[in-house]
């Protein structure tokens, strides 16, 4: 199987995205390190989707983005060329279902943690502040980006309630715009380009 990838890097650290497996990515200190992790990532992704794993794959870099961001902290601003194209209704329904499944599964994982304030991780500061260390901090951080991501594509959303509920409401707000499938590319915060396809990948 050929895995088409977008390579985002700052000359040191790498983020490698599998274009046709929306949301799948690896990170490494080098491109080679990220490539080595990709087969396990794709197999895990396919299992999560209820599909069969693959036994062999070829990694092909189809796009490169040189960045000045802190890639080692998963800071990213890339917009794939493929994320500029309009969506069909069928594509949107499929990608929305994945984004909602992700929220639902994340909530189930969070709910399964007995002590949501326990941590064994050391304190560490990144571009956005302290790294979330407890289950509660990780959950709140992930839930709270709902407002931010939707706002970047001019959609009014919130992060009230649980992560699934607020994400579902965000999509309902998006769908009130009759032209949302046009996938307009917008200049968001810090000069970063955003589209609906990018938001779906980031979720």
Regions found by a protein language model. Give the residues of each.
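Aromatic-glycine hotspot motif
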Residues: 1-203
